[in-house]
Amino acid sequence: MSEAIAKLLSPRSVAVIGASADPGKTSGRPVAYLRKHGYAGRILPVNPKVDRIGDLPCYPDVASLPEVPDVAVVLLGAERAHQAVKELAGRGCAAAIVLASGYTETGEEGARRQQQLVEAAGSMRILGPNTIGLVNLTDGIVLSPSGALEMDEFPVGGIGVVSQSGGILGSLLSRAAARGIGLSKLIATSNEVDLELADFIDHLADDPATQVIALYIETVRHPARFRAACLKAARAGKPVVAFKIGRSEAGAQAAVSHTGAMAGADRMYDALFRQVGVIRAKSFSDLLDIPAALATGRRLHGRRVAILTSTGGAGTLVSDDLGVAGFETPAPDAATAQALRDLQTGSEAVLDRNPIDVTLAGLRPDLLRGAIRALLASPTYDALVIIVGSSSLAMPELLAGAIQDCLPDSGKPVLAYVSPHAPEIGALLMRRGVPAFAAAESCTAALAGMLQVAAFEEPAQAAVAPASTGMAGMDHLSAGALDEAEAKAVFSRFGVPCASERVVRTAAEAEAAARELGGRVVLKILSSHITHKSDVGGVAVGLAPEAIGERLGRMADEVEARAGERPQRFLVQQMVAGGTELILGLHRDALGTAVLLGMGGVTAELFQDTALRLLPEQDGRLCPLAPGDALDMARSLKTWPLLDGFRGRPRADVPALVDAIVAFSAMAAALGARVAEAEINPVFVLPEGQGVCAADGVLVLG
């Protein structure tokens, strides 16, 4: 745990640079809020034009402060903030919070000012700039002018929030308070000139007051640090939930302009989150809903959900949404159904189906307790959703108390769906330890997040490939696109099996090669300039040896007519019979280097059924994917059933596919930045025990 970050979040003394005596001004709020919310440390306002703020003496400058503050809140504009930062650093202050905007997010001049700020800080840590600050609810410390702090009190709980947007931090704080959701720490990192997401994820992973970490992300500036921090949180048993904006082109552009940073492709973020166990919130409301469920500490170990209701329509709504998401809502087993009947719920109750509808009898606290206990004790169910209907509005305390009384009986998740518009009941349930939601979809999202946490296993780290692995014989390859034969020779060196083939120049050589390979063959042009050979007539399949010579001549003429280049070299390749065609490729952007796997062949771009996994890093060097990650890629494809024996098809050689993915990733790791582009399409995955075979390939070296 960083000492500077510990002081930033729990300072014994706070200097407020540019403080105003008017609490109605932004510059007056930090001092006012510190006092309003009971900060027990020393407050040191600095303003040469003000003598006192309330009963606090105000100092003319940083040099006049009677002590070195742990933290300073800098309220000056961008033109003057760096000078205050320099003076604070000179005094030995641990960290400064710089609120001013007008830095990298505004363009070149702002970037210059941001660099000036970095130089002024030296070794002092900086939160911001362009930040709204932070709030430590655990210890009652508010270092922010956010208007959300006008509220008198906030529920304190186990959810830590890190946001790259100051406005969103205030929104989450006020929304959580209104719903009775307890938070521990909230930090707005914003421009991240120094301290960033990863620093606070790492810190919160060690924070005993935080059980769940919620992130609002615009961009990840240092993927390796982010990955390490998230894995640390996972090892500590602290789930991380992230809402990442930039899913659309417009959103991505807005995110970049807001933070002044490069953004990776959205699907790359999906891959990164999946690999480090981060739950991706699909909506902004999920960013509170999912952590609220996880903060209970209850764990979900299956997909079978009991729905207890007193209103049929709302129960059906929840059941339908759960079913769409892949959850099961089985009927009660015989013993559970009998236990429910023994409660004497009345003749109108529906106890042998799910949702279990106890009708208005469910308003009796004793009956409700009995039904909840019976369902939680049932081996048929992994979780329970309780529907709070309109009839409960008259007795919310009795209802909440009855549910709360049953929580110690089981560690299974218990959620509530509040069907009417009754936010006060939802907040009451939240305060009693029952995650309560105003939408059926929120119940589903919360359970899906809990299931993802239970299923995550950190993949084994593959060893760093030696720089020389597979490099023998590559010195002669110059920068630029290789032809197919050269590309596949490189793939083969790294352990990717390739189809048997011969390079030829003449019809006679082609016929001899075809006879040597045996059976029917494929004829292709060899060119480093023409990537999509079939588009210009440069591929012919199923050729017999006696026909290949004549076909070579016609192919040369056709390619010359279409591409303006007469091919001089050709490839005669063994036909690959059977198997499933996949594509294996390399993708690189601001987040890092990733391997892509998907449905291959000529339909690859049409179906867009792909999986991405980022290569891990160790000591600054890329590593191959671990076999577990490679297998997870294959299983995540929509077309996975085709590999797994769908409708009587022979099972594919998945272990050989996993080996090929790992080998391809080892090539990407070993060659590093020298690989500009790499793709095998198709790679044939043959029936079980027969291996895989790369039938075409592209490799561009930088």
Predicted segments — roles?
Residues 1-702:
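Catalytic-core regions of core metabolic enzymes
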